[in-house]
């Protein structure tokens, strides 16, 4: 027996482990046969086996040589397949170009969307082992909440300290809060964000400084003395030119010099994924220098949930176990501090989710999945088109396949060659798709909302994006190449096409694969169009939503007088002067000061009506508050429903008053007038009398259910950060620069920020539905075009294959209408089946989009009916063109070849 012959057979094995087993079996068989021959020659069995082993030689070396021979042959065959595949693609340049462009479009869209999803959802923070980091939130069972934003809240600093010291599930726990600060080191004051953190912040995240050092243990324990700061890489690059000498230099924040001790690593901007790139971090011990108003006292008050906390789990500790352990501590704290912690417990969530926003993560995930699904449909339709093209091409390669089979090529060998060709097409499309994605991500990101700067999110085509593109390219190559390759490699391929080029019509019986592809293409196109239609309708409805105030001819700007250490008296004088100066500018109809931006949320406090409080077990309601000056309601044109609004007589020394919205009135006093009623806030026993009721306005986000809102006089409820809201008689853009100038003249060190028209604010608020509508319309349109091209291509091929049949029918007297019905009917029957399937699938998946839609049902009949008619019309057009071409068939010429 020849061992080389056996090794040669092994070279055809498909699996490595199978090859190894067969190789061992063959070697053992050879030795056994040699042993038997030696025994027959007179040797003893043991001697015979030893002699056989000596004759064979080194078994391990033979195994290694055999494996090397197999690998060499496999590599040689693979190289030959690649070479032949490239030659075939170059030979059919037109087909290859169409295929690569179609795939590149699909890959480019998929990679573009995945780049954004990867940056925001999959890898939101550049920290070590993010899976081990979890955020701690307070859940208050005794406080009624009216919005999902309030279901989970932060921790009080004293509670944080208890959790940190008493837990046994974390290696360490961090607390932080952020606040706007004024940087005074440039040409003009600028607002930055400062993280007030515990000293272990960077250590728990597992970060190393790009330059300098981070906080030392204990560097957060000296109130007003730990004047050190860590700056972000972007701030270092933009403000210090990446100079190493920045370490040790002062950074003036809120008029106080902080010594720069370190630079955070590139790409890190804190534990909020959509935060600005320019950030600063200072020790929590500097809170009294950076916070204003009652926030100064809130840091050490167990009642106020001012801190965000996260910890790193100990190895092997699951999140559920950690949460159960912390709930035990929470119960103990509730017993020890019943007034402050009654009804409060703790909940954990992954920091990866919390970085996007605990309440927004689900929305972002759903939106990301929807976009990936939409572009995935486009790619799948492109795959179906290519599969049909390859099926058509397979008929032209019938002779080639027959010759290859006759020369000894097995079906597996032919399959591998054809799949190599389809994979080469796919990889070529992926390469071009990466170029599309490189430009596409920048184009897509240029439509981001104004509050996100271009460099706030790193949309790099990193290793994750490249691996994703490579993965879908390989899967796609197999997907659109499998059916054509299987059909082309069939031993009976020659029987499917009769001599002379006759073919079959399109239909389940004659061409089941191609018919199925048409149905799938049509169904996927309809699903994509339904999604686009729902979002377009949603966007139209969102734009019609009344915010509750007149949004035209209105602009705002913000400033933080607390950053310049204004006391309340001078700050109130500044506010009055700013509003008066703004109102005196030509073209300005009115101006007011308010704590909150329109559609910007606000500080929330728990409200208790008179006669009810936490001691009586009453469940208070978390309510958004807004401190405003008397001219606020007139400037914003908020309708007064009852009572009055504030006036100059509402001062600190007079009775405490409030104006509430209709939602708050209905919530607390549903069957009676709220005028004259009184309430107090959690932790504050002083009663406030309701003197007026105004219409509801959008508080947190467009499309929300009306939220309870309490307006307080700025003179009675001072805040050190405020917005100037200005009503104009004409275009607000014409007055912005003048108003900004007159306010800046009051204090040249004041940073004036967030200068926007209300139109811009509303536009930002509707950014997500607007982008969703635009992108899904684009993707749906592409899906429609690709599906139409697919139907057209299949029917065109069918007409070519049926020329003899059509010629015979025409010769026997068939009219033009008969031929049109014959050809167009083939495609329309399949398109209608696809529509039915698509409607069923769309009805199921549309229900997942309910939370993303404004004022439109997921099963909106107008959308489904409209999309169905559009797709039917396009399908009919795609069928009609080949059908018209069938009328040009000359019966005499067609029959001449029969």
What are the residue ranges of the model-derived segments?
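Alpha-helical transmembrane segments of integral membrane proteins
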Residues: 66-97, 354-360, 389-416, 420, ...
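Membrane-proximal extracellular/periplasmic loop immediately following the first transmembrane helix
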Residues: 125-180, 304-310, 540-542, 546-606
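Mid-to-C-terminal secondary-structure elements
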Residues: 5-6, 180, 193-217, 226-369, ...
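Short, strongly hydrophobic transmembrane alpha-helices
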Residues: 94-120, 124, 382-383, 426-430, ...
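Small-residue-rich transmembrane alpha-helices
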Residues: 387, 423-496, 537, 826-887
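Negatively charged linear elements and acidic catalytic determinants
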Residues: 1-101, 312, 346-347, 357, ...
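Interfacial "coupling" helices/loops that link adjacent transmembrane helices in transporter permeases
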Residues: 382-426, 789-831, 835, 848, ...
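Short juxtamembrane loops and helix-capping segments at transmembrane helix boundaries
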Residues: 117-133, 141-144, 276-295, 352-361, ...
């Amino acid at each position: 027996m020849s061992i080389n012959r056996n090794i040669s057979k092994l070279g055809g094995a498909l699996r490595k482990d199978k090859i190894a087993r067969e190789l061992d079996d063959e070697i053992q068989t050879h030795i056994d046969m040699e042993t038997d021959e030696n025994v027959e020659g007179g040797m003893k069995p043991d001697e015979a086996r030893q002699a056989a082993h000596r004759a064979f030689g080194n078994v391990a070396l033979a195994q290694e040589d055999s494996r090397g021979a197999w690998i060499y042959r496999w590599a040689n065959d693979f190289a030959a397949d690649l070479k032949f595949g490239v030659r075939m693609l170059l030979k059919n340049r037109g087909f290859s170009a169409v295929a690569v462009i179609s795939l590149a479009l699909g890959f480019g869209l998929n990679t573009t969307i995945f780049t954004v999803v990867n940056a925001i959802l999959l890898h939101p923070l550049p920290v070590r082992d993010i899976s081990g980091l979890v955020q701690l939130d307070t859940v208050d069972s005794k406080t009624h909440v009216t919005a999902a934003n309030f279901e989970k809240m932060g921790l009080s600093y004293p509670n944080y300290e208890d959790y940190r010291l008493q837990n046994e599930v974390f290696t360490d726990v961090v607390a932080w809060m952020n606040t706007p600060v004024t940087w005074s080191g440039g040409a003009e004051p600028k607002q930055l964000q400062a993280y007030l953190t515990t000293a272990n912040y960077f250590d728990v995240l597992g970060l190393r400084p790009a330059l300098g050092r981070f906080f030392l243990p204990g560097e957060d324990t000296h109130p007003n003395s730990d004047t050190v700061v860590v700056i972000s890489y972007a701030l270092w690059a933009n403000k210090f030119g990446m100079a190493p000498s920045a370490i040790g230099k002062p950074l003036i924040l809120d008029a106080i010099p902080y010594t720069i001790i370190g630079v955070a690593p590139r790409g890190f901007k804190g534990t909020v994924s959509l935060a600005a790139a320019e950030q600063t971090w200072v020790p929590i011990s500097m809170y009294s220098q950076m916070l204003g108003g009652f926030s100064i006292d809130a840091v050490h008050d167990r009642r106020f949930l001012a801190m965000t906390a996260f910890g790193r789990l100990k190895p092997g500790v699951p999140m559920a176990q950690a949460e159960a352990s912390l709930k035990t501590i929470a119960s103990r704290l509730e017993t020890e501090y019943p007034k402050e912690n009654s009804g409060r417990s703790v909940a954990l969530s992954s920091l990866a989710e919390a970085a996007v926003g605990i309440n927004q993560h689900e929305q972002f995930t759903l939106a990301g999945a929807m976009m990936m699904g939409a572009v995935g449909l486009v790619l799948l339709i492109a795959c179906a088109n290519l599969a049909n093209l390859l099926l058509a091409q397979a008929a032209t390669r019938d002779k080639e396949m027959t010759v290859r089979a006759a020369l000894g090529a097995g079906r597996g060998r032919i399959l591998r060659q054809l799949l190599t060709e389809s994979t080469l097409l796919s990889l070529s499309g992926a390469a071009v798709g990466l170029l599309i994605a490189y430009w596409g991500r920048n184009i897509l990101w240029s439509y981001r909302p104004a509050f996100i700067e271009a460099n706030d999110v790193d949309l790099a085509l990193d290793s994750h994006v490249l691996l994703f593109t490579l993965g879908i390219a390989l899967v796609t190559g197999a997907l659109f190449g499998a059916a054509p390759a299987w059909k082309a490699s069939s031993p009976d391929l020659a029987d499917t096409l009769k001599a002379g080029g006759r073919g079959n019509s399109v239909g389940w019986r004659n061409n089941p694969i191609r018919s199925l592809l048409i149905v799938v293409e049509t169904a996927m196109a309809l699903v994509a169009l339904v999604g686009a239609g729902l979002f377009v309708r949603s966007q139209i409805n969102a734009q019609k939503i009344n915010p509750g105030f007149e949004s035209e001819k209105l602009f705002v700007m913000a400033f933080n007088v607390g950053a310049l250490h204004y006391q309340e008296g001078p700050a109130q004088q500044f506010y009055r002067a700013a509003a008066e100066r703004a109102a005196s500018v030509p073209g300005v109809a009115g101006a007011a000061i308010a704590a909150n931006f329109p559609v910007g949320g606000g500080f929330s406090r728990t409200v208790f009506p008179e006669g009810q409080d936490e001691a009586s077990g009453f469940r208070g309601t978390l309510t958004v508050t807004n401190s405003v000056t008397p001219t606020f309601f007139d400037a914003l044109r908020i309708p007064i429903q009852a009572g009055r609004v504030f006036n100059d007589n509402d001062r600190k020394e007079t009775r405490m008053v409030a104006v509430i919205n209709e939602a708050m009135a209905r919530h607390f006093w549903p069957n009676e007038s709220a005028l004259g009623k009184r309430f107090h806030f959690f932790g504050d026993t002083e009663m406030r009398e309701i003197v007026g009721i105004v219409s509801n306005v959008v508080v947190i986000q467009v499309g929300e259910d009306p939220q309870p809102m309490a307006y307080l006089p700025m003179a009675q409820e001072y805040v050190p950060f405020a917005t100037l809201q200005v009503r104009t008689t004409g275009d607000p853009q014409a007055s912005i620069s003048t108003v900004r100038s007159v306010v800046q003249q009051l204090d040249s060190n004041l940073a004036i920020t967030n200068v926007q028209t209300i139109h811009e604010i509303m536009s930002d608020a509707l950014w997500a539905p607007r982008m969703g509508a635009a992108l899904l319309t684009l993707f749906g349109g592409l899906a429609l075009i690709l599906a139409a091209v697919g139907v057209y291509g299949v029917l065109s091929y069918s007409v070519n294959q049926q020329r003899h049949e059509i010629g015979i029918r025409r010769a026997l007297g068939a009219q033009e209408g008969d031929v049109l019905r014959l050809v167009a009917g083939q495609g329309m029957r399949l398109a209608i089946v696809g529509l039915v399937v698509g409607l069923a699938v769309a009805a199921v998946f549309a229900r997942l989009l309910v939370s993303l839609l404004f004022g439109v049902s997921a099963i909106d009949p107008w959308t489904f009916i409209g999309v169905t008619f559009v797709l039917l019309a396009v399908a009919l057009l795609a069928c009609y063109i080949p059908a018209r071409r069938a009328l040009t068939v000359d019966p005499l010429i067609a029959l001449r070849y029969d």
